[in-house]
């Protein structure tokens, strides 16, 4: 498709070496991308220049899982988000000033059917907690390649959470709402969705939100009827292919990411 470079086809090939693809892309724009191994999962961590960070402001950790259900293209789930983040990384290294973006491509999200503790991000969040990295804003991007309406996923928080966590989570949700609202002319929605990598962070006491995209008619019908959107029915099948994607979804995702780079939230002790 004209709005995607030819190498996207290479990324969604059934035999693609997705780790090598991501690392080669980032190396090609001048970024190292070491593997962080946690609980047998291989997470990828692009390293941006230190002068693009300022400790006065919150770090914004942006996450997209690169794994996919075996023997499926995974074009929307989640190659679309990964590719948008790779393009974003290229914009970040060329923009002046700070951005405070921490970017991680996670492994093992598709294992979450075995429970949140089996999810790759759970071990990563546990490592964050061990290292004292608990004050980041965490934004998860999942299935961002199809649709015209950005969706903030509704999160059902466990009961009896500390009041400080609930306060921090609500403030993060407010920031997330402003970001997607401004990225699409005020058109956005909030829907109950399957947990993504945000679940692993929440389970470890770190607030995290997740974004996805849906066609407007599917989002509206889901709100009215509770009927599972066609977009979600395509996931984990051969129909999650290049032809299911649309250009506007990538344009909206790009604006969301740029808004995140512009966001400044003062870091409190």
What are these regions (language model features)?
Residues 2-53:
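A non-catalytic alpha/beta surface segment that caps or lines the substrate-entry region
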Residues 192-227:
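Short glycine-rich, acidic/polar surface loops and turns
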Residues 58-70:
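Glycine/charged-rich beta-loop-alpha catalytic/anionic-binding loops adjacent to active sites
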Residues 60-62, 104, 137-139, 207-211:
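Hydrophobic/aromatic beta-strand patches that form the interior of the parallel beta-sheet core
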Residues 218-269:
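His/Asp/Glu-rich mid-to-C-terminal helical/loop segments that flank catalytic regions of hydrolases
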Residues 69-182, 190-200:
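Acidic/histidine-rich catalytic neighborhood of metal-dependent amide-processing enzymes
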Residues 28-36, 177-190:
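Short secondary-structure junctions
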Residues 6-13, 32, 69-78, 151-153, ...:
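Second-shell loop/turn segments in exported
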């Amino acid at each position: 498709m004209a709005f995607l470079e030819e190498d996207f086809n290479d990324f969604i090939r059934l035999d693609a070496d997705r780790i090598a693809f991501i690392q080669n892309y980032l190396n090609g724009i001048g970024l190292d991308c070491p593997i962080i191994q946690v609980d047998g999962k291989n997470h990828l961590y692009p390293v941006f220049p230190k002068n693009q960070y300022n400790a006065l402001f919150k770090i914004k950790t942006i996450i997209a899982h690169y794994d996919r259900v075996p023997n499926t293209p995974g074009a929307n789930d989640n190659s679309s988000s990964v590719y948008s983040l790779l393009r974003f990384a290229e914009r970040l290294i060329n923009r002046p000033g700070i951005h405070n973006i921490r970017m991680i491509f996670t492994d093992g999200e598709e294992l979450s059917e075995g429970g949140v503790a089996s999810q790759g991000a759970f071990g990563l969040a546990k490592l964050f907690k061990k290292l004292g990295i608990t004050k980041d804003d965490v934004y998860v991007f999942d299935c961002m390649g199809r649709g015209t309406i950005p969706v903030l996923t509704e999160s059902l928080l466990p009961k009896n959470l500390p009041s400080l966590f609930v306060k921090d989570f609500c403030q993060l949700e407010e920031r997330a709402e402003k970001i997607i609202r401004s990225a699409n002319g005020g058109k956005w929605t909030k829907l109950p969705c399957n947990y993504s990598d945000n679940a692993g962070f929440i389970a470890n006491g770190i607030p995290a939100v997740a974004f996805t995209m849906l066609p407007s008619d599917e989002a509206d019908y889901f709100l009215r009827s509770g009927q599972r959107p066609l977009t979600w029915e395509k996931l984990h099948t051969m129909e999650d292919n290049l032809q299911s994607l649309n250009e506007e979804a990538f344009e909206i995702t790009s604006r969301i990411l740029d808004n995140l780079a512009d966001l400044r939230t003062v870091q409190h002790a």
